[in-house]
């Protein structure tokens, strides 16, 4: 057995492959008579019996196998699955518990299924194999036929007359240089992995990504559809010329071309819709006809010219004719080098005809390079030979009249032109510009030169029809792949396939309509330049794709075709762009305009595809280089940015915290959502990233496994980030349930704050009256001890949401998006800043960053500071002057002289009641060894009378501040206040937490407690 298109032989495989253990439970296994590697229920295997495994020991470990890397399955057998690390490292009979951060692999998710259904599928007949082509029939012949188009027979002699043999060779070689480089780049891209259907679009999109790939795919499909019209018009021109020679005219020359063209395109549509097998047979027939016409032409150049042919300008090989035709003879509005190049270049654009049917090739990675390069070589040789031979045999101008001969007795003094040397006088038609023959005037010059003219007509028919047919097949194939990727709206309808080969019949009809529209132009010299820029644009992108993939140094760029150069590819891309503007600058602008429009649309929509493109590799490379470069830059206060580590747990459980920090850091600095797992399974990390992306929050997600919350957060504080791009501010939710939760949880919570201070972090604590937990959160596990609510530290976010395994039937749709107070526009409210202690300026900087966002732009910022009644105005002016130097734009400053007054007794009693649970009572009968100090060492969260007395002033200050907040900021949108700091060893953790609680209690607006790391984050200096 052989897998289609990959060349991997599976002769040693049996009809049925085993299934490895899934979720620790292995299916029944053993040797099924085929001698294969099997897994058993006990997790063991028989790799040593009848297996290809390079070991003699029983093991679940599997030897290297093709199935482990393939994305597709072979009909008639189940695909093998590589064992996971969990299956290798855990005995499922002894230990069914998965590690907390365990995530099932794709292979394990595939492992389930009904065995009866699988056996039934195995007995079904395999689907019929569609026809596949090798490199000769599938690529080389197809490319040669597409290159040998209408230009070869009908315009190459005319181009030779205009540009001369010398410049015609330059045009041919320049075109071949561009197509040759593009062929090398195409070969490199096509051999960098298994190629599927879609041709040029597939190659570019999988290399550069959907943004550029989609735009070029659409343009290339359109260019091929227009090329159908170009080749069809060439065929119709020949038919109408033959009709006129025989006195047959339907309407007039232009309308005759239109009628014949539409009929021809309709017939070609029928052949193409019959299937690739019939189309390929037709191409082989056309190829044989063209080869016969070439032989007929070469023989004709050798045969001596008859008087009838001499009258039309053919004199066989003459050195004088070669010399005269070697130099240019520009005529008409198209008479220029780039005018001729624009007309000739479409004849060289057929090099991608083979790549465009990559899905119909036996082995695209072999067929595309070999067939494409051979086609370029042989067609270039044929173009050079024909231009040289036609230029050496036929003069530029001839009348076609037998009466224009010169008798041997007559004088040739009044005769002008090269034909005078051969006793022919075409002077009159040359002077009057009425010559109808010669390579400058007669498009059918190759028929004139040939030994048998009808064979050249047959060659023209074969070349034009084969090229038109190839383009008629290429355009729908490319467009079908583009439709299946769903990058653009309203085009999916055309991607549906029919039959065993999934023929895109709807796309065929669309191509037919486009071709007919351009056939109605009925002017070959008008159609050819239109598509030149589109093909050049495609070639530029192919060359740039190869260069970009090479220059990023991605380990995934490993083309088996080695004969390419990244710098040569870059040169090819630049040449294509330059030539686009030299040919038709306005058409080049239109082409680039269309590309950039489609590029912008794709960037805006952000299609959910991941193809491992070189753009992704380049993004990584650039980010890595920038990160390394930042290590050489010293920190400066002017460049300070709050880079936030947000203890959200699963981000979907605390949307308010995510929204507030996301608003602070969006397009400004780093945001990282931290998640500590202490018990139970963790949700898949990709799910959280998807949720963040759908909420349009620019944040990273980082989950760690730890024995407890504090050690996990410590891991995040020390290990999060990269180089200088690492968090410097810790944000977390307030622990509302500290009074009813275990005292150890409160101690760990405050310990996290101290750990952050020790690591030089700024710290922010957010308290929202409604709590930070979403009302109906999706599946998630809460980090113990973060957030308010009567729940215990090990509860889940909501009883209706329990995390399940990925292998269950639960839908993997993205989590719902709960709303939060920070998602709404805040209107004309106020942001109240209580700048009571100087922490370096972080308390001022965060509200300033908020006011730069649209949601908060309408809010007025008020700054409250402490002061004395008798110096109130002086202190206000001092603070205003300082804030003005910071250039923050805050103009409303209020001095609060009453914050030093004693609080109300009722509030003091309420505070004491909140800490009574944690107080140590002094017993006079206790031994000194077991006194409060000894008990506090064992339980450091407990509060002694000495602690209360020592910290009484600070406690009363927090109670009084809450009363001030109730008076001044009841209607604010947000309150930002400097966080008090309790000294370790002096202020017990529960007392510190009680301060934070009483300071922010019973406030309707959200409260953000902020404490910087006591270093400047604001400066009024310019250096």
UniProtKB/Swiss-Prot annotation:
Broad class of where this protein is predominantly found: membrane
Molecular-function GO term, any one: sodium:potassium:chloride symporter activity
UniProt topological domain (Extracellular) ranges: 241-252, 301-335, 391-452, 522-526
Reaction it catalyzes: chloride(out) + Na(+)(out) = chloride(in) + Na(+)(in)
Tissue: Expressed in urinary bladder, intestine, ovary, skeletal muscle, eye, brain, and kidney.
Keyword terms of this UniProt record: ATP-binding, Cell membrane, Chloride, Disulfide bond, Glycoprotein, Ion transport, Membrane, Metal-binding, Nucleotide-binding, Sodium, Sodium transport, Symport, Transmembrane, Transmembrane helix, Transport
Annotated membrane topology: Multi-pass membrane protein
Region of interest called Scissor helix, as start-end residue ranges on this chain: 614-629
Cross-referenced Pfam families: AA_permease, AA_permease_N, SLC12
Protein name from the UniProt record: Solute carrier family 12 member 3
Organism for this UniProt entry: Pseudopleuronectes americanus
